[in-house]
């Protein structure tokens, strides 16, 4: 098992020094989902939610979240992201509908973008919940997980199967 690098000699948290790491292309893809009743699905699709176009707002919120990850996750480095792409698709499951969210983040730098992708996917889901909670407070968020990451000295990661 590898040692955690976010602790100093005193066992206190520190931001890892990445100044000696080479700059390479880094990507990460993360996913989340929101399970909801049919009524919410139909109102989102018909753009009848009082707070606005849910998917457009969630998409912008997700992009903003990716760019702000280092301000809310203490040990994340601020990164100059090169791209954030968010896609949505619907799945029907009995009486419920599931909004699947997928986020791809890219940069060229000396640290990965997994946390940016995960934060973005999470904030997309939270935004959908916030905009629709007046209709259904029983929506279920998640799971939220990393699908893949590329670049860096630890190599690539590709999830073996869907969750």
Curated annotation (Swiss-Prot):
Subunit organization: Homohexamer; trimer of dimers.
Enzyme Commission designation: 4.6.1.17
Family matches, as Gene3D superfamilies: Molybdopterin cofactor biosynthesis C (MoaC) domain (3.30.70.640)
Family: Belongs to the MoaC family.
Superkingdom, natural source: Bacteria
Biological role stated in the UniProt entry: Catalyzes the conversion of (8S)-3',8-cyclo-7,8-dihydroguanosine 5'-triphosphate to cyclic pyranopterin monophosphate (cPMP).
One of the GO biological process terms: Mo-molybdopterin cofactor biosynthetic process
Matching InterPro entries: MoaC, MoaC_bact/euk, MoaC_sf, MoCo_biosynth_MoaA/MoaC, Mopterin_CF_biosynth-C_dom
Annotated substrate binding sites: 75-77, 115-116
Catalytic residues, chain numbering: 130
Entry keyword annotation includes Lyase: yes
SUPFAM superfamilies given in the database record: Molybdenum cofactor biosynthesis protein C, MoaC
Name of this protein: Cyclic pyranopterin monophosphate synthase
Source organism per UniProt: Bacillus pumilus (strain SAFR-032)
Keywords carried by this UniProt record: Lyase, Molybdenum cofactor biosynthesis
Pathway stated in the Swiss-Prot or TrEMBL entry: Cofactor biosynthesis; molybdopterin biosynthesis
Coiled-coil region list: none
Key word Lyase present: yes
Matches recorded under HAMAP family: MoaC_B
Catalytic reaction(s) noted: (8S)-3',8-cyclo-7,8-dihydroguanosine 5'-triphosphate = cyclic pyranopterin phosphate + diphosphate
Signal sequence segment: none
A GO term, aspect molecular function: cyclic pyranopterin monophosphate synthase activity
